[in-house]
Amino acid sequence: MLKATIFTSPKREEGISGGSAKWRGNHPPTLSKALFEFLHPKMVADPMCGSGTTGDVAKQMGIACWQGDLHQGFDLLKDEIPVHADLVWVHPPYHDMVVYSGKVWGKEAMPNDLSRYPDYESFIKGLNQAHYNAYQALRPGGHLAILVGDLKRKGKLYPIQRDMTW
């Protein structure tokens, strides 16, 4: 059970598997499992699914899950999530910490790839739009879960979660 805002797991996979550890910036499947056990969603949406960790865990736990990602053709900045969910899970890039389009996947940069936004301010603006769009897919009483970390550049800390619009 998730009992705090800080999650720790000594092993990446403890009786559950998912996604690809080779995908830069992914999260451990035990985090998805703990969140599902805490919230008990019947339907999950993951509009920034990356290698599919959340969907893999949902499937193993018998939870319906819709997944999309920019590398699959779904653009959270302009596309509507096609389901209504009890839990929308968003794990965005941390600005340009890992550049995705044209680097991790694909041959070309994508214009709405948040990891390629030219500056931190425009990244935060785009991130806020993505979160707003994700929120629109929630069922009444649903939860929007956002996994985000801080960014440090040239000795300066950028606390992404503090800078997001709530």
Indicate where each model-derived feature is located.
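Class I S-adenosyl-L-methionine-dependent methyltransferase catalytic core
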Residues: 1-166
